[in-house]
Amino acid sequence: MLTLPKLDIERNEDAEDALVETTKTWLADEGKERDPRIHASDLLDPRKAYWNRQHKEELDARMTGNFFVGKVLHAFFSTAMNKKKGLSLVDTDVGGTWDKSLGISFSNDWEKKIKSKDSPNGIPYELKTSRALNEQTKKDMASYLEQLCIYMAAKLSLVGRLVVLRLMAKDNLKGWGTYPQYRAYEVRWTKKSLNEYREQIKSTVKLLTKALKTKTKKDIKMLPLCREWKCGKGNCGHWDLCKPETRYGTTKWK
């Protein structure tokens, strides 16, 4: 063991700001490769998708940190699963596949290329990260499944795989501390549910396409509201532009 000498250590907030700006620029440049058409993720928060195309929201420090970690971890996951050498950022949420029948671009995080009765076009995978300390319940994972279900619908698959990388999972073996741990889940639905979800997708795509074309208040208001955790003055830079009905101006959403 080496004994450290006396050191002067001072936090440098200017350097931190510079790092955020550098990361923000890199993320913006990477985003230029994204397919400009409607993406699977646009369907989760349709109003946000509309307003972001009219007034691009600049990333703040929080968003920059979250997107950066997510993009890097997805790149490592994709590279490892595809058994590639080095690190590949290709197809990390850029919309690598266009589905004409649904009218969306999408890029599932990985795909098990097997063909079966339940999965005629392969089994799609979705990777999510979580900083939760406690084990998550099925109810907790609802927000993780929305995008996976879009991939399953596009692939006409009755089965999908959800992988959650728990960054702060407790070390139950040692009884103390935390370390990143995988949780893997198989997700299934019926043919009826698959077809119903496809119709939901088509309906939302139709509404978003029309709103983007007409830009009228009437058509914008026809778009489904965004997920609650993505909405609100503190969570969305378009809050005062969107003014979502039943939320804007109410006590709960101030």
Where in this protein do the model-derived segments appear?
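Metal-dependent nuclease catalytic cores that hydrolyze phosphodiester bonds in DNA/RNA
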Residues: M1-P124, R131-E135
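Residue-level detector of short, conserved catalytic/binding motifs and their immediate flanks
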Residues: N108, C149, G234
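Metal-dependent nuclease catalytic cores in nucleic-acid-processing enzymes
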Residues: A75-K84, K139-M168
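Mid-sequence acidic-hydrophobic segments that form the walls
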Residues: K84, K113, R131, A154, ...
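Covalent nucleotidyltransferase core used to form phosphodiester bonds in nucleic acids
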Residues: K128-Y144
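Metal-dependent nuclease catalytic regions and adjoining charged, substrate-binding loops involved
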Residues: K138, L156-K254
